[in-house]
Amino acid sequence: MAENPGLENHRIKSFKNKGRDVETMRRHRNEVTVELRKNKRDEHLLKKRNVPQEESLEDSDVDADFKAQNVTLEAILQNATSDNPVVQLSAVQAARKLLSSDRNPPIDDLIKSGILPILVKCLERDDNPSLQFEAAWALTNIASGTSAQTQAVVQSNAVPLFLRLLHSPHQNVCEQAVWALGNIIGDGPQCRDYVISLGVVKPLLSFINPSIPITFLRNVTWVIVNLCRNKDPPPPMETVQEILPALCVLIYHTDINILVDTVWALSYLTDGGNEQIQMVIDSGVVPFLVPLLSHQEVKVQTAALRAVGNIVTGTDEQTQVVLNCDVLSHFPNLLSHPKEKINKEAVWFLSNITAGNQQQVQAVIDAGLIPMIIHQLAKGDFGTQKEAAWAISNLTISGRKDQVEYLVQQNVIPPFCNLLSVKDSQVVQVVLDGLKNILIMAGDEASTIAEIIEECGGLEKIEVLQQHENEDIYKLAFEIIDQYFSGDDIDEDPSLIPEATQGGTYNFDPTANLQTKEFNF
């Protein structure tokens, strides 16, 4: 998991305050937001896309001479300014093919050759749509490169001409202009806002109609995703307001690529703070978003989980909107999903519900999800265990005594204590805080809790943590031992000793505590 030390420190400090506000308990993904996305290689998730080489009717015999010889950049450059339209088109096609045919197209060589102004000039040629198309394609591929290469296209004043081409009567020219603008917008918030300021949104959204070919609509949706990306700064509020109605239409689409992109767009918007979350809620899309958590396509589930997960980082009221859509009924399947990253995101979602009010905590309990969270705490990969630790600790702060008592009855303490020996000091502190909260809430039953902690090896781990280099951790460890373990030795209850297995792990009997202990916090 990507770390943000400043934020984590702030979060940890807040964590120690029993009455801390929900804003500090709820956790945004920060750098982690890209983790699932980066592991995907699906084209629809890329910020920029190169248009691949395709032999088509566009590639007529006019470029036969160029195919027959190894054309130099100098020749391309010279012929691209020819007065002979056939020669000029062949040269621009040759440039486009250089940019389309190779895994590492010679973008910098072409930029250095001085061809950019020539290609941009070709965009003006309304009398020759084939030339406009080829030039737009070449510029699209240049803009698909590095940020510096994209900036070279922007600085050549291509953007106003691409916007003009959105009104071309030739659909292939329109579509190529859309693709080029998508690459430029995908470069970052500065380019995004520049293209928005020139008026891209209205003509772009006008393409969303029943007659548009599916490939064109996929491109339009991908550009909408890029308009919604980036939150430093987020897109202008007016732009979000313009885009949301389109997303509310596209979320019904049966094409998987369009659906996935639509949901990712919503996830980016909900990652932009509570005001943008509210705009998404007000659009009415949430009831249509939640059922996608059980979509048969993992790509759709992943995007939907991120989008609803971002919404529940908002206020209790915003969280309740999602809960009111029966969202928790989807979580047994998500928590037992074969993909670990889905498990992790699902537990992250639930950690933000257990950071809510007591009714929201109860909803998680009533949905039967606590045992599944505890299973992930014990058996999940480390990233998932970390999220589960937050979910449990948040519950010890937000929950009522009976809710925390239920947590203990589900045998949360042994797997919780196991995390005290990990190297991640953030996790260690979250667990210590959770244990301390449980002990405090147990009141007269604290000795029973202390006994469970000792029997599962937790006390030994806490004793070691008194030597921890982190001041907050060693102080907390000392406080717990001083307040709850400094008296007479607790009589050992043999029924609580875990059975050792091969490999040095332990099998904890989940019924042992219930048989031998009565919890009345």
Swiss-Prot record:
Protein name: Importin subunit alpha-4
GO biological process: protein import into nucleus
Pfam families linked to this entry: Arm (PF00514), Arm_3 (PF16186), IBB (PF01749)
Compositionally biased residues, Basic and acidic residues: 18-29
Motif (Nuclear localization signal): 43-52
InterPro entries reported in the protein's UniProt record: ARM-like, ARM-type_fold, Arm_3, Armadillo, Importin-a_IBB, Importin-a_IBB_sf, Importin_alpha
Tissue: Detected more or less in all tissues examined (Ehrlich ascites tumor cells, testis, kidney, spleen, liver, heart, lung, thymus, skeletal muscle, cerebellum and brain (without cerebellum)).
NLS binding site (major), as annotated region: 137-229
The protein's role, per its UniProt record: Functions in nuclear protein import as an adapter protein for nuclear receptor KPNB1. Binds specifically and directly to substrates containing either a simple or bipartite NLS motif. Docking of the importin/substrate complex to the nuclear pore complex (NPC) is mediated by KPNB1 through binding to nucleoporin FxFG repeats and the complex is subsequently translocated through the pore by an energy requiring, Ran-dependent mechanism.
GO cellular component entries: cytosol; NLS-dependent protein nuclear import complex; nucleoplasm
